[in-house]
Amino acid sequence: MRKIVVAAIAVSLTTVGITASASADPSKDSKAQAAVAEAGITGTWYNQLGSTFIVTANADGSLTGTYESAVGNAESRYVLTGRYDSAPATDGSGTALGWTVAWKNNYRNAHSATTWSGQYVAGSEARINTQWLLTSGTTAANAWKSTLVGHDTFTKVKPSAASIDAAKKAGVNNGNPLDAVQQ
């Protein structure tokens, strides 16, 4: 009887040890979360004005891709580079990310750059919510107005022409602080 009890205790302890070691390895949860973020971020995204953001989220936390603006004087696609949190929180928070586009390509050099910073939010209606800064080269006297500020929400669903027109008419994201003063 004693041998049976000892064997039963040994089996129980082994089971507890295996269960504890499987759940005590947070790196497995983190790796799974990172893979979900990587797969979710990668793809084609559209903002409310119809600009197209094509991105690849790499396992090392880098972002690479192109950006095609639907507004301003930008022509064709521009290279983008950025970073994302490749070890995101596992508490349901968004995944922090950011990228930059220098508005120079084979067609045009606008002597400006835009940086977006925000969060990727996973789910059935995945989105990337961002704030952006657009800085243009200016003279020292005009440096005070060299940077515009705005926000974009990107989704994987291209907006309709009607919703783009409505956003433009509403003045969404023109980023010019002087427009608010002049109205």
Swiss-Prot record:
Residues 37-159 form the Avidin-like domain. Residues 1-24 form the signal peptide. Belongs to the avidin/streptavidin family. The lineage of its organism: Bacteria, Bacillati, Actinomycetota, Actinomycetes, Kitasatosporales. It is found in: Secreted. GO terms for cellular component: extracellular region. Homotetramer. Keywords: Biotin, Secreted, Signal. This is Streptavidin-V2. PANTHER family: AVIDIN-RELATED (PTHR34399). It comes from the Bacteria. A motif (Cell attachment site) lies at residues 83-85.
